[in-house]
Design a protein with these regions (language model features):
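Bacterial N-terminal signal peptides that target proteins for export
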Residues: 4-15
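C-terminal motif of bacterial Sec signal peptides marking the signal peptidase cleavage site
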Residues: 23-25
Length: 390
């Protein structure tokens, strides 16, 4: 009897320990939840999210990575982007994959009639030695599009022009090809057309080691650099360097992260919105996904804008959602009426790119926010483009 009682007591203790371990394992720090992931489904064919057919070039200049901003003080829209050297004779199609000569700027009162302001920064006259140097190209090399390349990588890509309201100052951010990093320029005249010089933080080397640098000014005047394509750093008060090292943005990723580019941060309705660009690819079941094998470029379909939102600029950003099909590497801005617009450039790559009559030209797309999400405004696009004949 004593033996049975002792065994029963021991069994009760074992059951109690097991129950305690079970409770601890299902609560508090012991709870290992499955990480949240973004849905990689690409809604190819969804008309309301696709760049409308009414959209056409607003300027007959070869350009990629179109950027537009509106400056209320003078009532002008300013346009820039990745351009090709205007006096260069190409073997085959116009491109910027090896070299170009600098940064160009246009302005307009209505986004339909553009005034050329010329080259506002050049390698030969304005660049620092590290920017002029470039990188050699192997003989016989071609671009991703099959364009024959010259002997040097020395092109400036993806420029952005920003008026920093809290400092009454114009800055430009841009990057170099050939793995030579990104930089920030400041206008020494206080005007958007410059002339421009390097800030101290990139006088001798790149301020960010990769491409596609962007800039964001918050409501409190804090200015951040946002880099390819998951990094952010606050600038110092003088805007001549960084106040902190670049850190990784907290995101909700896909199960397998693809190549992502064209970063942009915008604040709307108290939230921060992280815009990025990613390619869709077809799946065996007929659907499309943003998860792909980066080596299979031949199956690229559409060049899409995805968006994620957060309550803080560093994140965490929630699940990504598709916003603009075939409108990638964009920025968004508000016009003089407070209406929203996005930029695009008719990327020739991918299946959808082959459908364009003309590619690599700047365009703008009216967009809207519906239930906190960004999307094209097809009705406004039709109205804007009805008297533009290209």
């Amino acid at each position: 009897m004593i033996f049975l009682m002792q065994n029963n007591t021991r069994l009760q203790r074992l059951i109690l320990v097991f129950c305690l371990l079970s409770v601890l394992g299902c609560s508090g720090n012991g709870d290992k939840e499955t990480p949240q992931l973004s849905d990689p489904t690409a809604p190819v064919g969804e008309e309301r999210l696709t760049v409308p057919g009414s959209v056409k070039p607003i300027l007959d200049v070869w350009m990629r990575d179109t950027y537009v901003t509106y400056h209320a003080a003078d009532g002008f829209y300013y346009l820039t982007g990745t351009t090709a050297s205007p006096d260069r004779e190409f073997v085959g199609q116009t491109h910027c994959w090896d070299y170009n000569d600098g940064l160009y700027l246009w302005r307009s009162k209505d986004m339909k009639n553009w005034e050329e302001m010329g080259r506002i920064w050049s390698f030969d006259e304005d660049a620092a030695p590290w920017q002029k140097k470039g990188s050699p190209i192997k003989p016989g090399a071609t671009s991703l599009n099959g364009d024959p390349l010259d002997s040097i990588y020395r092109a400036v890509w993806a420029p952005e022009l920003h008026y920093i309201e809290s400092k009454d100052k114009w800055l430009m951010v841009a990057c170099l090809n050939g793995g030579n990093g990104s930089f920030v320029l400041e206008s020494i005249s206080g005007k958007p057309e410059g002339p421009y010089r390097n800030i101290q933080g990139n006088a001798e080397q790149a301020i960010f080691e990769n491409i596609d640098l962007s800039l964001f000014e918050d409501d409190d005047g804090s200015v951040y650099l946002v880099g390819h394509n998951h990094f952010i750093a606050k600038m110092n008060e003088q805007l001549d360097g960084l106040a902190e090292p670049f850190r990784r943005i907290e995101e909700t990723p896909y199960a397998s992260e693809p190549y992502i580019e064209g970063v942009w941060i915008e604040k709307h309705d108290g939230q921060y919105h992280l815009l990025q660009t990613v390619w869709s690819v077809p799946q065996d079941d007929g659907s499309y996904s943003y998860i792909r094998d980066d080596k299979k470029d031949s199956v690229l379909h559409s060049y899409d804008v995805i968006v994620a939102s957060a309550d803080a600029v560093y994140g965490p950003y929630g699940p990504r959602y598709p916003a603009i099909i075939e409108g990638g590497h964009n920025n968004i801005f508000q016009d003089e009426h407070g209406d929203w617009w996005s930029t695009l450039f008719f990327n020739p790559r991918g299946v959808m790119g082959t459908r364009f009559d003309i590619t690599c030209r700047p365009a703008v797309l009216p967009v809207k926010w519906e239930q906190g999400k960004l999307m094209p405004d097809a009705e406004a696009a039709t109205a804007f483009y009805q008297d533009i004949h290209f």
